[in-house]
Amino acid sequence: MSSTRIIPFRPWFAGGLGLCAAAFLFSAGPATSMCQLVSDTTQGNRADAHAEEGMQFARAGNLTSADSELRKAVALAPGNAEFLRDLATVLAMEKKFDESTSYFQRALKIDPHDVAARRYLGANLWQLHRYAEARQNLRILLHANPGDPQALLLLGMVSENTRDYGTAAKTLASVPTLVRAQPESIAALARSYYHIGETAKARAWLNELHNQAAGVQAVLLGAQIADEMQDYQTAETLLSSVATHYSDQTDLQYRLALVKFHAQRFAESSHILQQLLDDGHKTSEVDRLLASCFRAQKQDEEAIHVLQDAIQLDPENEASYLDLAGILIARKQISAALELAQRMTTAFPDSSRVFVSKGSIELAASDFTDALGSFNRAVQLEPRNADAMIGLARAQANAGMTDRAKTTLDQAIARFPEKSRFELELGQVLLKEAETGVKSAELRAEQLFNSAIAHDNRLAEAHYELGALALGRGQAAGALLHLKKAAKLDPSSAKTHFALSRAYRRLGRNDEAAKEATLFDKLKE
């Protein structure tokens, strides 16, 4: 089933660092000032003159001229930490974060104890998603000044970005005034509370978004966070709260339909979307979500028809093609899917996602040679595309190139920060190898499944594989733990319910076994 998600609203990422840098550069207070006004400059000192002129340009908002003058000052006095800091700040305000970072680092080599420079170096590194380096600099700063509020705020944001939700919640909650200043930080704290099971605190912080200067957009961000965290009632409440204030009622209704879709209230979602279409608001996004609702209700023909309309309405939107391809594969309409694949690659010759879809169709058609070519092309177009790497490994394994498939997945585990999917895939390749008599393969497969769960406990397939292994060894009680988890994560998996039936039967729990067998029979149809 296609799961439609709205791209996260990131207002602070867009402008927050520039505002911080401006305050840093022009604040009169000694604790937060990035540079001291050069009032005692000697008239004949060319470097000081360029620096002073650069500062005047910066204060006037002319960042291009400020940049030019400060570069001249740094060229004449490369060992002057103040000039380096000033230039780094102007560069940050221009959103030249990589270059700004290098100048902050040069300044800190000269003066490692400059609190403000280190704080804003941390902000730069966070903005660049260089989280490990950002954390290191912020830890140094907090070691010297444990109560630095800006450093605590940034450390909380870095922790949330790296999924260290306990640290994020603790750190952000320690600076509530700063958190309240930006919707992004409120969202980060709420998301962290959700992840550590503090739902009431998460909701309380999301309610704070009503008081934001960003207005409706801040509340919409809160609704998105609640939706992502499966707190659907809170998401709906937040959306309803802006119904009379939001000028774009079409967008609001679409968001509400999206929440209801995620809550598996497909009929309600469909009703809202159909009303939008009836009112003339026909877009490919509305069509795609409506198609997902139809598919969830096993109305595949209706879904196909709606997606065909979406493609005709917006032929340059590859997402509609990809959704349609997914349905055709699921329905085993291989000929139609192959025809669509050719249309997609003609329309989107440089799309990695399109070549992943084409490769998946070719795998379904047992055309492993063409699948290898498609997935290789997808990897060339986007080397960090996890779906492309997994597809390539599957094509290699199906083509009898097991060793190459294992190498592909081992390399992906080493390269990608999100390892769990690759560990699961490699474990499944090894299980097939174990069936040929390679005894060590099953042991490593089990280790990989456990590692995958350690990295992401929501992987239903990994829980299923561990349950199946335990069941095969006669360990029904151990199998039951994993299989119940797998069924909770993926209730529509027929094979999981079949395995659960077997486990319950072996434990003498015949009534529960019968219920699972009934579910299996229903789902396999």
State where each predicted segment sits:
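Canonical tetratricopeptide repeat
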Residues: 86, 120, 154, 188, ...
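TPR/TPR-like (Sel1-like) alpha-helical repeat modules
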Residues: 488, 494-525
